Swiss-Prot record:
Keyword Cytoplasm included in the entry's annotation: yes
Protein name: Uncharacterized protein YHR033W
Subcellular location: Cytoplasm
PUA domain span: 315-406
Residue numbers binding ATP: 170-171, 214-220
UniProtKB keywords: Amino-acid biosynthesis, ATP-binding, Cytoplasm, Kinase, Nucleotide-binding, Proline biosynthesis, Transferase
Molecular functions (GO terms): ATP binding; glutamate 5-kinase activity; RNA binding
Amino acid sequence: MTKAYTIVIKLGSSSLVDESTKEPKLSIMTLIVETVTNLKRMGHKVIIVSSGGIAVGLDALNIPHKPKQLSEVQAIAAVGQGRLIARWNMLFSQYGEQTAQILLTRNDILRWNQYNNARNTINELLAMGVIPIVNENDTLSISEIEFGDNDTLSAITAALVGADFLFLLTDVDCLYTDNPRTNPDARPIVLVPELSEGLPGVNTSSGSGSEVGTGGMRTKLIAADLASNAGIETIVMKSDRPEYVPKIVDYIQHHFRPPRHIGNGTQQQFLDLQDTELEQLRRYDVPMHTKFLANDNKHKLKNREFWILHGLITKGAIIIDENSYDKLLSKDMASLTPNAVIEVRDNFHELECVDLKIGQRLPNGELDISKPIQSVGCVRSNYTSLELAKIKGLPSEKIHDVLGYSVSEYVAHRENIAFPPQF
């Protein structure tokens, strides 16, 4: 019996729009619609993250190249986004399916209640049998609040709704050890147990996105890392054969066996693992793809932790000592107090997300700048950078004496502190 999954399918501009003519690839869009409809009939819930608004706008306005001026790009996006969702609506309506457009910027999820509202809205649409089509709101986004690319947006969307799978559809069938277009000896990478350990023997520097898109393989690796941290399996596969998605899901559910050892191992062990998995794919007649395994329940981020680490924009940094860091990681889950803070960097307001770093404290209480500083997580500070600079290193009971008021005895409460998964 097939389990019902929540599946996010991300399509880049180069998958949906011809790079030279800027015209939509209606044949690919039709295949996507057929695939999503079939997945729904199998009982799965499906969300599409669709790029292409700017590219469709370029075609509609007969503009040959994407301009550099932000206001022009946003105007083009305003034209294209409406036309793009209209095409999706037209294609899905032929199968009796309803769609809904959701345009997001980071500004829409900067508050926890907004983040929850976005999740509730998408889940309500799924419960109604509607197919949400998500895109970044390029008409309103500015560099400070944009996701940067729809690979990242798709990972955040998948984490937002607690999806089971994230499919990143692209112009290659899988990840390779090098660019297969320029290196005939490039080997396919079909299974990555632990992305945080790096990819032994893999060069991901080539390929920086297309004329009509912003992504590349690097952005897909970032998205896969985000999704894995949220407990979501990520699959990279070729966009011109979306009908393979159900077959890959079926293979993972019924035939795939995770490797016995934890992590990627040495470079040779990693490459041997690829040969073993390739044999399995051939045995079950499963098309080539790259599978990034999800973190297990013990190591995956909770929803709020993911929001703090990946949904918010960091402003400034708080540097603490290593002993204080160890206490924050302990089972008692301590909150962050002023006496743990060695130094405050850059400017931030209260409840903004701040980079948390560890450094060495000198005998006089100041930061030892000769020692390395390491980023370890993020916090939402109860105090501004100016306030915190005045109370750093002090016990909590001194806050009122120094500031004349006390917002909290903590710089950040435990629920507003998040660390990447600890292995």
